[in-house]
Amino acid sequence: CEALVKDPKNQVYSLDNYFTGSRENHIEGVTYIEGSTEHIFELIDFAPDLIYHLGEYSRVEQSFEDIDKVLLFNKIGTLKVLEFCRKHHCKLVYAGSSTKFGDGGLGKDQSPYAWSKSSNTELIINYGNWYDLKYAIVYFYNVYGKGEISIGKYATLIALFTEQMKKGEPLTVVSPGTQERNFTHIDDIVSGLLIVGEKGNGDGYGIGSPETYTVLHIAQ
C-alpha cells in the first residue's frame, strides 16, 4: 500500500481482517476496509483494476492446530476473491508459497498451510484457463523487514531473534539449527510485486535471493 499510494494516479484500498495485521501500520492516503475475504462481495462494491491477494494464513507448523483458519482464510476466502475477480474482470496477483517446491515437490502436502497454498495456485491457473482470468502468481522466501510480527506464535524468525536480543534473552533455535533458508527484505518484495502487477502474467514469479543461510548463522 505504501508504495502504491505514492503514485497519485492510484486509488488504494486495503481489505484486512487484522488476524495478524495491525492498525498501527496504516498508511495515509489508503482507504482501509475491515473484514475478511470470504465477505468480499458484501464489503467491496466497486471493480478494482488490480487485486494483490496477500492476506492468507501464512504459517507452516502452526497450521496443524489452526486448520479451521487455514480452510476459512485460504480456501473459502480465496475462492471468493477469484469469483470477485472473475465477475469484475480484475487482474489478480496472488502470493503463492515456496513450500510447494520443497523436497522435490513433495513439500506441497506436508502441512495444511502448504497444501492450501499449492492447491490454490492450481485453482488460479484453472480459472485462467476456464474463465480467461488475468493473473500472476508470485513466490516469497522468508520475508523480513518493517512490519514483521515479533511476538507470539506467529512471530517471524528474524523479528523473533531481534526481539529476544533487545530483551537480552537467549535466541530460540530449533534443533539442529543447520536448516537452510533464503531470506528476502520486504523492500525487494514490494519492488517485485509492483513489476509483476504491471507486467506479470501467469505462474512462476519467484522474488528472493539465491543465497541461503542456516538458522544458526542468522542467530550468530
Annotate each language-model stretch with its function.
Residues 119-127, 157, 161, 218:
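Hydrophobic alpha-helix immediately C-terminal to the catalytic Tyr-X-X-X-Lys motif of short-chain
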Residues 1-143, 187, 193, 197:
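N-terminal Rossmann-like NAD(P)+-binding domain of SDR-like oxidoreductases, especially those catalyzing
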Residues 33, 138, 173-174, 207:
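Hydrophobic residues at beta-strand termini and immediately following loops
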Residues 15, 95, 174, 207-208:
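Short hydrophobic segments within beta-strands
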Residues 73, 147-155, 177-190, 204-220:
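Substrate-binding strand-loop-helix patch
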Residues 143, 159-172, 181-206, 212:
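Alpha-helical substrate-binding/gating segment
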Residues 78, 97-99, 116, 172, ...:
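Ser/Thr-centric signal marking residues that sit
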